[in-house]
Amino acid sequence: MWQAISQQLSETLMFSYDIVEKVHLSGGDINECYMISDGEQRYFVKINSKDFLSKFQVEAENLRLLRQTDSVTLPELVLIGNTKSNAFIILNFLPTKPLEDTENSYKFGQQLAYLHLWGEQKEYGCDQDNYLGATLQPNAWHKKWSTFFSEQRIGWQLQLLKEKGVTFGVIDEIVEVVARQLLNHNPRPSLIHGDLWHGNVALSAFGPICYDPACYWGDRECDIAMTELFGGFNAEFYRGYEDIAPLPFGYTQRKEIYNLYHILNHCNQFGGHYLEQAQKSIDKILSY
């Protein structure tokens, strides 16, 4: 496998790249991750089964979408390929550490705000479906945000769970409540990261960096809500964001709805205590 990767990388770089070092990196729940080096240039490699190739192609498209905004910093795509039994994606390797200091947290908050203010789009969705972790994320275009989020986010996750024998109530009733609570909220469609927890943000030599997006055009509050779901963001991050793009009235209540999507996705992927967390969140939303 590594010989095939080395050969394809050499063809892409147009010089012989012989792997003399490879280090297995921890933290990947879905892929096997490595740092490789020829003694001079290092790269980040994610490896999975051969049928994962299309998912890597979607990831590359998500990176392209976000990079064109010139707002947030992301890894640079080098190569997508496959061997006889594996698919892989290669990105430039950037040594990182947790994003914790106030100066860079503030800077990242501003960068995220500029991302959310970039471009113009009249509908919600994306040209292609992508993945939130290992879960397919449907992105068919919709004109109404309440329809898009209630059906393609909450309803979708609830249906996947039902197929696994897990239910939190009547799906149509939950979807209807979510749609009703978002009915009068018509946010300007923003290109969002889509999976913005602290594990997908770090500090590199070039400043704050983010990766592993699941982007689509939606409500920018979804990104901010997720940063609060699992914590880990400095208070200066939020100050930097709101100095550029203040959050509108009603965010606190909508945050519960937006984070339910990610809790349900964790139910689908991991189960466990997320099931209880999801039920509590649904009960709270139904009580509004």
Swiss-Prot record:
Q: What keywords tag this UniProt record?
A: ATP-binding, Kinase, Nucleotide-binding, Transferase
Indicate the enzyme's highest-level EC class: transferase
> One short Pfam family name for this protein?
Fructosamin_kin
Q: Specify the superkingdom.
A: Bacteria
**Protein family per UniProt:** Belongs to the fructosamine kinase family.
Summarizing the function annotation, the protein's role is: Ketoamine kinase that phosphorylates ketoamines on the third carbon of the sugar moiety to generate ketoamine 3-phosphate.
Protein name from the UniProt record: Probable ketoamine kinase VV1_2562
Q: What is the lineage of its organism?
A: Bacteria, Pseudomonadati, Pseudomonadota, Gammaproteobacteria, Vibrionales
